[in-house]
């Protein structure tokens, strides 16, 4: 019989809660802000947004774009986030300040990603210094 070993990796996922100006939760997402591959997936979505021109007119075009963006966000976050993130607001919803919901989500992830990576790098440097001090003695 095989032995099972459990390894605890600490907190990996960050939950970002989306609220309206009245404080009502309208969406949420779980993202691993420590995943360095997140950057390449963010870049892929940015390229997709620049070049994507769905067929059709008016509402058909917006619906096609919504479906495509939902798929891209599932890929970005690594799970099916449709109900959680887009249950109230669709990806192409225009916010009161004129910005598209998709853009706001991407900006929030990007801003928080840089901070988390910096935190993790500082923590890693402290651990390495601690171990190096042992060998200097």
Annotate each language-model stretch with its function.
Residues 58-69, 114-116:
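Contiguous, amphipathic alpha-helical segments that mediate oligomerization or scaffolding
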Residues 1-59:
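Short N-terminal mixed-charge amphipathic segments
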Residues 81-137:
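C-terminal charged interaction modules
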Residues 53-63, 87-88, 92:
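Short, surface-exposed loop/turn segments at secondary-structure junctions
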């Amino acid at each position: 019989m095989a032995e099972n070993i459990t390894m605890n990796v600490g907190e990996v996922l960050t939950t970002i809660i989306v609220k309206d100006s009245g404080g009502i939760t309208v969406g949420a997402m779980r993202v691993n802000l420590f995943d360095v591959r997140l950057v390449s997936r963010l870049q892929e979505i940015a390229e997709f947004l620049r070049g994507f021109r769905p067929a059709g007119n008016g509402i058909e075009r917006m619906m096609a774009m919504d479906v495509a963006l939902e798929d891209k966000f599932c890929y970005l976050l690594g799970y099916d986030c449709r109900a959680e993130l887009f249950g109230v607001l669709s990806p192409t919803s225009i916010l009161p300040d004129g910005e598209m919901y998709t853009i706001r989500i991407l900006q929030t992830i990007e801003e928080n990603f840089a901070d988390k990576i910096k935190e993790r790098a500082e923590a890693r440097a402290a651990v390495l210094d601690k171990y190096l001090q042992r060998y200097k003695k």
